[in-house]
Amino acid sequence: VTLIVAGYNQNKYVWDKDSDAAKIPDRRSGMFLLADSLISTETPSGRKALVSEFRKIVEVQIDIWEPHFIRETFNNYLKVYQSNKCFIAFAGSTLTAQHIINNISGHLSQLKIDFEEGINFKCVVRKPCDDNNLIRLGNSNQYGEDIFVPQKDYHNLLSAEFVSDVVEHSINKALDSKMQYVLDPTALAAMRTDIILAITCPIERRDYLYKYKFASKVTDNGVIAYCDKTFIEADELAIIGMESVYGSDINQVAKAALSTHNYKENITEFVAQCVREDETNEIGLPIAIKTIDGNRTTKEFIKE
């Protein structure tokens, strides 16, 4: 079990459009993620620690590949046009999480610029598993020199919302591939994994946090596992892992800290206290503190 908390830095504020008396973070100052680092297992004599200093927040590269042309003919994707970073944090089954993260990384590292069919020419970004017009048409089509011009056609193609959709797709594909081995409710519970995405939108330059909660439902074809995506508002936190145990208290600390200039610090201090005082062997030190603001990332640790 794990405790992960993610929130927006509180350096700048704007008026809440739904309240004339409240200010909320402007979501332009970066995000922070806190995670314990203990991996434990249940034994006949109780829960025992297996590994400490386990990474539960992973930096994932986002690469958009641009099309290469020989004269007016498409000739594959040979060069990365744009790179960005995001954080993926997980709580739950480490095996399922590794499968999910591999799937997310595989998708986000192979995004490709394509064109949308229609009257007006328009470039779009596609997942590697999407239908791709350039690849489909191959060298049978000719493209004029006035299109696929990076300076005018490749700007503002990658949004945080698009990345969040790719992550959602990747999680669901990973869960779907594991369901063939799930034979009973115990096996289903064992694969439960929740995910947090933190990314600064390359277009808006605003910060976005998303939480993906593990869910399942019964259909005519059996049980389906999937993720339920939620956008985290400016004055909220994303909490996964031992949310049912510590979530309420952490949210109370966060609410009280909104009016201070020590929002991240107060939350970090309280989370550290929770981890230090936990006697279940489900969470443990050190605590990783990671931040992301655009493509700038930092990390530090609380070891005692």
Positions of PLM-derived features:
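N-terminal nucleophile
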Residues: V1-E304
